[in-house]
């Protein structure tokens, strides 16, 4: 398609009516605009602070399709740089992570300090007899880097709102993972990486707001693992949770704001996640009192939930998997998944967390495979001309949004709804059609007000 004006984008997504045209998942022109206006100016997750604890530690990642290296400085601060030599655009760092005193380009040998300064140019005197202003040719620095309770984010846009303002009420939900115990969290093990042939918005939307698929897409896993109270055989250990949470929950909530979203069940027991090892379920019971003191009852009990910070940072409560959906064109995403656990947990519990996350949501995880097949098959369908120009229904519980009076913040709906999907694509369209953050925020404010008027 050819984008000539903003109305061409809003024609593809009508959040107020619950309509979406699947061209948004496949069009290469839209994808290039996303790289510029979403990945070029939204806050993007870079690394967990535990992955770069010491001066000189670095972690290689992406902001959209731009390779970025995140580095711990000598003074303890964190900087991030475009992984691009200023001479001929070669990467200066190929290692996934490590510790270094300098980054040296393998093409012509230009070297940069961990602070990004150009510190050495081979044969400088004879190659540049007129002189070379090295101060001018340091690595391009990501201008905005902030840390939220251990999660390091970056943003190319200096006019963007602060990270805490960008997160909004989503920070309240995020704290349920990051702030359960004194000492915060850390990454356990390495990063698992794999490719899925689908558009990045499909998994981001599902993690943000789709509990609806679980009973159907994951039916076999539910049947095998969701043991009932009194059952003797528990596939994941003697202390495994003894019922599917959706059978016993007293309520269920979906939250949406500014493209972010999550969904969860309100439970009465601190082990309500059927996908984790018995050792993990037991750990949640044993540490519940501390979590409730720090977070309150709702978040301390919130152990079966799905979440996404727009655009591409997702996690699952209880299961301890956190992942980033790195876009690789309009029809492919590179998944980076890692296990995040309480730093205060014992080594045995951390190992159980890692086992649970890998078994369910690693590249060969029994739930991950269900999800990936859905996304890949959707992308295949959208190769067709008629299919990608059709209209899809996004009306679930349209008009049922509300603001709760029980302390759960933000615009909410029942967990089986598409409030999050509508809000995510409204934010997507607002970002693509707005020149400034003032415009983006005003459009979001108007949309949020309409939901609960």
Swiss-Prot record:
The UniProt family comment states:
Belongs to the bacterial ring-hydroxylating dioxygenase alpha subunit family.
Q: What quaternary structure, including any partners, is listed in this protein's UniProt entry?
A: This dioxygenase system consists of four proteins: the two subunits of the hydroxylase component (HcaE and HcaF), a ferredoxin (HcaC) and a ferredoxin reductase (HcaD).
Q: In which pathway does it act?
A: Aromatic compound metabolism; 3-phenylpropanoate degradation
Binding of [2Fe-2S] cluster, residues: 85, 87, 105, 108
Question: What Gene3D superfamilies does its record include?
Answer: Naphthalene 1,2-dioxygenase Alpha Subunit, Chain A, domain 1, Rieske [2Fe-2S] iron-sulphur domain
Top-level EC class, please? oxidoreductase
Q: Oxidoreductase: is it a keyword of this entry?
A: yes
Q: What is this protein called?
A: 3-phenylpropionate/cinnamic acid dioxygenase subunit alpha
Q: Which PROSITE patterns does this chain map to?
A: RIESKE
CDD domains from the UniProt entry = RHO_alpha_C_NDO-like
Organism of this sequence:
Photorhabdus laumondii subsp. laumondii (strain DSM 15139 / CIP 105565 / TT01) (Photorhabdus luminescens subsp. laumondii)
Name what cofactor the protein needs: Fe cation; [2Fe-2S] cluster
